[in-house]
Amino acid sequence: MAVEKFETALKKLEDVVRKLEGGDLSLDDSLKAFEEGVKMASFCTKKLDEAEKKVELLLKKKDGTFVREDFRLDDE
């Protein structure tokens, strides 16, 4: 995939959604747009997952010191 930046992929995904919601595309063009949207959504999800793994939270303990912890969502 030629897309390298999250922001670029997100913009393309938003454009695809707008086109599909417009209802003016032929069935063939709709399928092509949908396929492109799925690719962009997958790329964005991958980039967000990579970023999440890099994020660390700096938490203040009761004694005033700070501890670093990996970022985790509550459902993990």
Swiss-Prot record:
One biological process term in Gene Ontology: DNA catabolic process
Keyword Repeat annotated: no
Keyword Nuclease: yes
Keyword annotations of the record: Cytoplasm, Exonuclease, Hydrolase, Nuclease
Pfam families: Exonuc_VII_S
Entry's EC annotation: 3.1.11.6
InterPro entries per record: Exonuc_VII_S, Exonuc_VII_ssu_sf
Subcellular location: Cytoplasm
GO MF: exodeoxyribonuclease VII activity
Main location class: cytoplasm
Catalytic reactions on record: Exonucleolytic cleavage in either 5'- to 3'- or 3'- to 5'-direction to yield nucleoside 5'-phosphates
GO cellular component, as recorded: cytosol; exodeoxyribonuclease VII complex
Summary of the function given for this chain in its UniProt record: Bidirectionally degrades single-stranded DNA into large acid-insoluble oligonucleotides, which are then degraded further into small acid-soluble oligonucleotides.
Subunit description: Heterooligomer composed of large and small subunits.
Family that this chain belongs to: Belongs to the XseB family.
Protein name: Exodeoxyribonuclease 7 small subunit
Gene (UniProt): xseB
